[in-house]
């Protein structure tokens, strides 16, 4: 097993989210964004100044993407919304599915500007979710019978997508059209983690094609080569890290969200940093997230 590198980073936000998720970074404003899904909150952090804000939401938001300097796309249990960055006003943009018991979970923007977004049951009901492709307002279902969609990310050339169903805990890869982000083949197994500690959660793919994956329940971020070889493990000071994001002026730092979901009082006392947001404390070769293309 790859040796675990001790945590050498810092806490970016002490606000403990029940389910911190969906971090991203807007290089135009130098601002990191993430969600407390179950708390119906959108968190904002200006990295240079340290200025923080928490925006209440009327839904369970999980993924944010920049559209342009004045607009953001948010995925939620009620569909896709456009958020005005100045007024925080929300406008409905598209419906993902007609399943009121579901919510959005993990997702990411492909280099072509399309969105891959996963849905799941609010209580992680078996096979209740799916993974969708969104191009403008056109929604296409890609994969059904997903329990907990996660690890959605794309290779730098846009020709490969990665994803998992955390309930199965197998990291998958699939060839896709770089121009559209639509699959051109069937998913194949990249790494079987079904007998390994923790769950394969959110992931990002760096400029070298390495996959940085948050390992829920294992207090770590793990790094894979495109062939599935695990090459590094970095400790996170919380048991349930949920998703990473590249941040900083050159996307050279790694932010990681976490969660205290499912913990009783004793577990939370033993895990005092659960739900906080961290910087890993290492230099990475990250990539900025593309804008969503309307």
UniProtKB/Swiss-Prot annotation:
Molecular function, one GO term: calcium ion binding
Positions annotated as active site in the UniProt record: 201
Cofactor binding notes: Binds 1 divalent metal cation per subunit.
Requisite cofactors: a divalent metal cation
UniProt GO BP: L-ascorbic acid biosynthetic process
Residues binding a divalent metal cation: 21, 150, 201
Pfam families named among the record's database cross-references: SGL (PF08450)
Gene3D superfamilies in UniProt: TolB, C-terminal domain
Broadest EC class assigned to this enzyme: hydrolase
InterPro entries: 6-blade_b-propeller_TolB-like, SGL, SMP-30
Consequences of knocking out this gene: Cells lacking this gene exhibit no detectable phenotype when grown on galactose as sole carbon source.
Keywords: Hydrolase, Metal-binding
Function: Involved in the degradation of galactose via the DeLey-Doudoroff pathway.
Protein name listed in UniProt: Putative sugar lactone lactonase
Organism the protein comes from: Rhizobium meliloti (strain 1021) (Ensifer meliloti)
């Amino acid at each position: 097993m790859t040796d675990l590198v001790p945590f050498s980073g810092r806490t970016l936000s002490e606000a403990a989210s029940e389910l911190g998720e969906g971090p991203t970074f807007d290089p135009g404003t130098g601002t990191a964004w993430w969600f407390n899904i179950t708390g119906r909150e959108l968190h904002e952090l200006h990295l240079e100044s340290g200025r923080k804000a928490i925006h209440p939401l009327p839904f369970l938001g999980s993924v944010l993407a920049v559209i342009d300097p004045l607009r953001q796309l948010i995925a939620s249990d009620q569909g896709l919304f456009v958020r005005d960055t100045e007024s925080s006003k929300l406008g409905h943009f598209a419906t993902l599915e007609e399943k009121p018991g579901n919510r959005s979970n993990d997702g990411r923007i492909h280099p072509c500007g399309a969105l891959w977004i996963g849905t799941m049951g609010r209580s992680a009901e078996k096979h209740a979710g799916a993974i969708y492709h969104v191009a403008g307002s056109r929604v296409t279902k890609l994969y059904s019978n997903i329990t907990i969609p996660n690890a959605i990310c794309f290779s730098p050339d846009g020709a490969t997508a990665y994803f998992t169903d955390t309930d199965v805990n197998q990291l998958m890869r699939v060839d896709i059209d770089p121009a559209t982000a639509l699959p051109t083949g069937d998913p194949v197994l990249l790494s079987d983690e079904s007998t390994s500690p923790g769950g394969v959660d959110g992931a990002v793919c760096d400029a070298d094609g390495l996959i940085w994956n948050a390992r829920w329940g294992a207090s770590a971020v793990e790094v894979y080569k495109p062939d599935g070889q695990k090459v590094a493990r970095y400790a996170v000071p919380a048991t349930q890290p949920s998703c990473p994001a590249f941040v900083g002026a050159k996307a050279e730092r790694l932010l990681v969200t976490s969660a205290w979901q499912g913990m009783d009082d004793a577990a939370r006392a033993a895990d005092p940093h659960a739900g906080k947001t961290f910087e890993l404390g290492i230099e990475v070769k990250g990539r900025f997230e593309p804008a969503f293309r309307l």
